[in-house]
């Protein structure tokens, strides 16, 4: 049992009303420190620091001003101070676009999905339960993507939309029976997606052409990447365009907005061979 009157124990500190983070979370306290110093032969914490820190970087209290780190804070005071600092941020409307969107994550989804401990265990987080919960979460995610894209299978998943687009380009190259060497990318594709496709294609020696569909020569390309909605927000029905390209021997990848797919005709129903997109739309905040 823990002695509540032991000034060096956590229980003792809390019993005395000492709710500072430094007492609760920063290493040992009281008799523990004394015993540890005696074990290693150091007379004090200052002596230990003087022996271990090189003199060229050691702050000498006798010659230099002490660090102004303030007094220890209680948990409530520390959280209030952090909230005050965060409130100084100015939140502006984002016009970044290019497939990146400001999002809202409804509290029921955050608590019951993202923070639901049932995904990994009902008691102690053993690895087996974490793996089982992760497997279930991935299965649900993949089924949702299948429903939204209209495809038969889905993975879970790649780094981002641009990486997925580059992987689609190489997958279509392997799946295609066409002798044409090039890959066509619609000009309305998000700019970062175009750049990653170009970078991947460079080392695979795949010629990439960025342009509009009406200028496309089907005999030059084995595959095409289309964007719907495109990077400027235009929405189209690609059914006829995809059918025309496939009739000419091209494989077609469509980059889509999965949230828009809730209302739009799915890319799979329009005939796409591969569908890619970004799950950032489902409530992941933007980070800079």
Regions found by a protein language model. Give the residues of each.
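Charged, compositionally biased N-terminal leader segments and the immediate start
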Residues: 1-28
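N-terminal entrance/gating region of PLP-dependent enzymes' catalytic architecture
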Residues: 28, 51-55, 59-140, 146
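Conserved beta-loop-alpha segment that forms the PLP phosphate-binding cup at the N-terminus of a helix
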Residues: 74-79, 142, 154-179
